[in-house]
């Protein structure tokens, strides 16, 4: 857990990181508005998602039903279409899901890792590339994931 928190502290563009373990339990590391990173986890598969104090945050959480998991079920790494964040009402999430295979899977005991990017940081990064041209961030299917200010106007 500490390693994920340290990485997130160094990468402010990450809103959350989720880990689906090889026993199908789930850990979610989520950045709050005050930049504090909170950890949620499941003690049983598809059971309640609880915070560090044991308080139930989501009573019946099934990671395999989340948009980032459904979009990547074909065992490929993938960008996922924007979807409603379950732990940040009114906010859209954009995730990249990474399937862990081979020696890394054996070492980490993790099946999937998903990272939610912060829209503001992504858009600011695209703005830095060029303020005079439209800059689009596309996924392989040519779907627009994000765009700079000029392209948003």
Region roles according to the model:
Residues 2-9, 13, 104, 110-153:
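Solvent-exposed, extracytoplasmic
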Residues 16, 77, 94, 134-135:
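Beta-sheet entry/capping signal
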Residues 26, 95-97, 144:
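Hydrophobic beta-strand positions in blades of beta-propellers and related beta-sheet-rich domains
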Residues 1-76, 126:
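Extracytoplasmic/periplasmic sensory segments of membrane signal-transduction proteins
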């Amino acid at each position: 857990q500490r390693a994920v928190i340290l990485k997130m502290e160094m990468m402010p563009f990450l809103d959350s990181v989720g880990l689906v373990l090889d026993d199908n339990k789930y850990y979610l590391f989520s950045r709050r508005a005050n930049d504090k990173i909170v950890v949620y986890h499941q003690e049983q598969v598809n059971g309640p998602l609880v915070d560090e104090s044991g308080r139930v945050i989501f009573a019946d959480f099934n990671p395999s039903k989340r948009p980032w998991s459904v979009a990547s079920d074909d065992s490929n790494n993938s960008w996922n279409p924007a979807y409603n964040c379950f732990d940040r009402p009114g906010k859209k999430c954009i995730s990249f899901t990474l399937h862990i295979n081979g020696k890394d899977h054996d070492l980490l005991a993790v099946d999937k890792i998903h990272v939610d990017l912060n829209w503001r940081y992504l858009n600011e990064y695209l703005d830095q590339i060029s303020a005079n041209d439209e800059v689009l961030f596309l996924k392989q299917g040519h779907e627009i994931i994000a765009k700079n200010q000029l392209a948003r106007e």
